[in-house]
Amino acid sequence: MEERPTTYKKFSYDCEGETIINSVRISCYENEEHGEVDLDRAFAKSCNTAFVTLGSKLDIKQFATLNKKCLFNQNIPFDLSVKKSRFELNEHSDKGEIPQTVIGQGNTLMTPFHNALLMCAVANDGVLMKPYVIDHIEGADNTTVKENIPEIYADLMSKKDAKKLQKMLREVVTDGTGYSLDTDLYTAAGKTGTAENEGKYAHAWFVGYSNVEDPDLVVCVLVENTGAGSKYAVPIAKKIFNSYYNNNMKEYYGEKKNTAQSDE
């Protein structure tokens, strides 16, 4: 979207389940044929062949710069020790590495922490806040002795691009691989992922957020050696979201009941 802000909207592709780019065969999960897709539909359905076709036309140097902007190969300040996510593709890379890399495979490695931060930025209109574990510390007399004040860490994308991604992420839930998260209890948006694992069962991914009107919770799930993200990671995310909102509803209605009793 940054490299081709006008033409990406016209993208169209006929998915037949697999394709060959730079002598590398790329398949959609279980060779599913998605048929005619635009960018939004390809995203919602996790169409690998559409994205590898689109990604193979990107300027590799600009692509690497974008990933640097998104904090790959960097230490992210945090209270706990976390590894760096790894992105190796550059203008000197073998052409065979491009197809795998543009769909998040190959030598690309990403931590759940990093994935969650990127989703936080998207949900926050492109702005990433500095992450921390402890909100504040209170003394024995209940006074605050230390407090972490929210501060901006980085602007990762424009508000316009973030809004577009929010719409696409929402469609993953309403009409895509994250459909099992579509519920009346809350609204959700996110992205599933299925990372290949050298002939073993794939790693299942899901990262997303809830309450799309005013996002309040980001969840990232990685289940190793299992299979599709929609089958193994999404159900876990749903349990987390459900627990969060069910508990909040209990607290809310409990407070209303107590208030009503005190008024009487």
Each model region followed by its residue ranges:
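Extracytoplasmic/secreted cell-surface and envelope-processing proteins
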Residues: 51-53, 228-232
